[in-house]
Every structure is written in C-alpha cells, then in structure tokens.
Amino acid sequence: MISSNDFRTGSTIELDGDAYVVIEFQHVKPGKGAAFVRTKLKNIKTGSVVERTFRAGEKVPKARLERRQMQYLYSDGDDYTFMDVENFEQITLQRDQIEEQLRFLKENMNVHVLTWNGNLMGVELPNTVELKVVATEPGIRGDTATGGSKPATLETGAIVQVPFFINEGEMLIIDTRTGAYVSRA
C-alpha cells in the first residue's frame, strides 16, 4: 500500500482492477476542510488519462510492475518485436500498446518492457534519447534575438521544437517524457 501523501510522478498504483501511473499530482490544503491530493493518472494498459482526487493519507494498493530490459529489433506492420537482452527471448507488442512511445523509438534501442500480473503492458523508454534531425528550415541570421524556436523532423518521424541554430543532420538529445529538445549530442 502507498499513501496518497507519498505520490510522486512515476508512482504506480492499482485502482479499479487496473494499473495506473501518476502523471501529475498536487497536494491541496484548503482553508476550510481536510487536505486532499489531486492527481492525473494514466492507465498503463489503455493509455487513457483520468483525473482522480484522494484524501490526504489515503492508502492505495501499489501496482507492482515488472520491468525487463529489452532491445527493440524491428517492426512488421503493426507488430513491434523486442528481444530480452539476457535470454534472447523475443516478444511482439501491438502498435496500440506502444503508440505514444513510437515517436522516439528507433531500432536497436534498449528499453524496459512493463509487465503486470503476467500481462504485457507497454514500453518504457529511457529518459533521453539521441536522434538525428532529418528535416528543418535553415536558421536565418538574426532570428535568435527573440530566442525563438522552429519545428524539426527527427529520424523517427517525430516533430519537435528546436532552437534556430539547429541544422539538418545534427544529432540531438530529446527528453522522451516531455518531447522537448535538451541539447546537441
């Protein structure tokens, strides 16, 4: 059991027979009445996001997710194949199970495959990944005065906002949790 006071971003809980990960949480202490914790929870199986409020100190069952280190090998239509790096066992996940992670997933990348109660739940990417810019507009001299940004298409097809000084062919470090540019590689 985990107390609602101990919720952190990334905490996993069991609710209504499903596993959820805490995306956002906020402790609220109103002037009148008891404190409570407002959360945004993501269903690990379906990917849907729900908002839920818990009383401060309320006990909730902790979802025990098993994380296995695997390597992404290839895709075949809507099937994505991963290999366990320890015993070389291969598993296949459907596109709808890993839809959000596809933006930053590239071949031979090491990831964690999540299982809960023996069921494959999804993929957890590293916090940052190194990706190549395949298309972006050239930065025009003097554009940086406002510190703006421009869209860039990465090798995985994801489009992220990058500073004006980034050019095609450069390797970037991208935060997979937010989809934001971090730095040049």
Swiss-Prot record:
GO MF assignments: translation elongation factor activity
Pathway the protein acts in: Protein biosynthesis; polypeptide chain elongation
Pfam families: EFP, EFP_N, Elong-fact-P_C
Localization per record: Cytoplasm
SUPFAM superfamilies, A to Z: Nucleic acid-binding proteins, Translation proteins SH3-like domain
GO biological process, one term: peptide biosynthetic process
Main location: cytoplasm
GO cellular component, one term: cytoplasm
Origin superkingdom: Bacteria
Keyword Lipid metabolism included in the entry's annotation: no
Family: Belongs to the elongation factor P family.
Chain's role: Involved in peptide bond synthesis. Stimulates efficient translation and peptide-bond synthesis on native or reconstituted 70S ribosomes in vitro. Probably functions indirectly by altering the affinity of the ribosome for aminoacyl-tRNA, thus increasing their reactivity as acceptors for peptidyl transferase.
Matches recorded under NCBIfam families: efp, PRK00529.1
PANTHER family: ELONGATION FACTOR P, ELONGATION FACTOR P (EF-P) FAMILY PROTEIN
Protein name as it appears in the record: Elongation factor P
Species the sequence originates in: Heliobacterium modesticaldum (strain ATCC 51547 / Ice1)
